[in-house]
Amino acid sequence: MYAPASTRSWQAGRERVLYRISDYRDCQSHGPTIAERVWTAWWQDSGLKVGDVAEHLQDMTNPHKLPTGFVAHDGDDYVGSAFLIHCDLEERPQYLPWVAALWVEEGRRRSGVARALMQAATQRAAELGHEASYLCCQRDLEAYYINCGWTVLERGVGKHDLTMLTFSTNI
């Protein structure tokens, strides 16, 4: 079973900043912030309301099935989050599971938080018996994910011209 990542640290100038990756079910107090970030980044033009996204988070409280979520936090402060879900790209429903809604607060970016969140999600996928995880992104983010160990499967997918990537969990 997934164990929360140990406390990680990084140096920002002279300030030492710590964060921890936890299962969403242990950090549900961050739910309203996560819902707002996810809604603002990906759903505000879709007709969904923030409350709809918050309601979806209720489905992420069972560690033995999808969907599930992960939270990066510094004590009570939200740092970032990621989901592991059934499908994130309606044009490719045959692939499962998907790392989705990866978000890191602007002041905490470029510090390894996103990579740690992806690692937690892909580790959970392996624990659930999946040999690979999938992710989609805009073309300008493709190089970042490749650098994190993901492999491009397909480019130009769907109406948003997304890149689809995979990560082998080697179970």
Describe every region a protein language model picked out.
Residues 104, 110-123:
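Conserved acetyl-CoA-binding loop-helix of GNAT-fold acetyltransferases
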Residues 69-71, 77-87, 98, 103:
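Conserved beta-strand in the GNAT
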Residues 125-137:
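Conserved GNAT acetyl-CoA-binding A-motif
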Residues 1-33, 170-171:
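Conserved N-terminal entry element of GNAT/NAT acetyltransferase domains
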Residues 60-65:
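Short loop/turn motifs at secondary-structure junctions and domain boundaries
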Residues 29, 35-58:
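Conserved GNAT-fold acetyl-CoA-binding loop/helix
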